[in-house]
């Protein structure tokens, strides 16, 4: 008889917790999100003037045209369905070759001298492969290339970069970063790239 009562009690607790944690709590979070955080609860989507979704402020995109600031490399080619890192060990020869190749390409694209330090986020993919940010230092090294390609004053491009720079969380966690999608959208508004330019 005692086992039967314990079984009934277990089933009641399981049902109650399933209802509470599997139904009421998610519903409450959904309602609070929709009311108080509508932009974030929809995925921080960025739309153009016609309402078409361009991307998300939370997910990186690939920019490889010389007139754009370039994002971090991605092991998953910015595919949200297969996000992740390369999972190569630091001692992996494949990783070392990839980093060497990316460093050479970054130096060439940005006309850097062999002694100019290359920021790690310019050649290393993030763990998710979807990071929307680059470091401020990475952005600074790309300013001359972007300014040249857009026929703009490098100082005005740098000002735009500084405007889009986010400070470390609480002033101490992390480093200054720049959301590449938001920065490139602002570039297109201020310095449109004409076809055949």
From Swiss-Prot:
GO terms for molecular function: ATP binding; P-type potassium transmembrane transporter activity. Coiled coil: none annotated. Part of the high-affinity ATP-driven potassium transport (or Kdp) system, which catalyzes the hydrolysis of ATP coupled with the electrogenic transport of potassium into the cytoplasm. This subunit acts as a catalytic chaperone that increases the ATP-binding affinity of the ATP-hydrolyzing subunit KdpB by the formation of a transient KdpB/KdpC/ATP ternary complex. HAMAP family: KdpC. It holds the Pfam family KdpC. This is Potassium-transporting ATPase KdpC subunit. One of its GO terms (cellular component) is plasma membrane. Its main location: membrane. Belongs to the KdpC family. It is found in: Cell inner membrane. It is a single-pass membrane protein. The gene is kdpC. It comes from Methylacidiphilum infernorum (isolate V4) (Methylokorus infernorum (strain V4)).
């Amino acid at each position: 008889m005692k086992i039967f009562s314990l079984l009934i009690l277990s089933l009641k607790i399981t049902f109650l917790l399933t209802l509470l944690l599997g139904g009421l709590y998610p519903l409450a979070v959904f309602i609070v999100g929709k009311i108080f955080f509508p932009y974030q609860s929809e995925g921080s989507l960025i739309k153009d003037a016609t309402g078409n979704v361009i991307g998300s402020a939370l997910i990186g995109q690939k920019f490889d045209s010389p007139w754009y600031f370039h994002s971090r490399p991605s092991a998953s080619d910015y595919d949200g369905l297969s996000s992740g890192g390369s999972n190569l060990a630091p001692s992996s020869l494949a990783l070392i070759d990839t980093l060497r190749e990316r460093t050479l390409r970054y130096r060439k694209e940005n006309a850097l001298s062999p002694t100019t330090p290359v920021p790690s986020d310019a050649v290393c993919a993030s763990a998710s492969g979807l990071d929307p940010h680059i470091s401020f230092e990475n952005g600074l090294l790309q300013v001359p290339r972007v300014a040249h390609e857009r026929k703009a004053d490098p100082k005005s491009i740098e000002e735009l970069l500084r405007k889009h720079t986010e400070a470390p969380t609480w002033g101490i966690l992390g480093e200054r970063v720049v959301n590449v999608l938001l920065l490139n959208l602002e570039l297109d508004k201020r310095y449109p790239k004409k076809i055949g330019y």
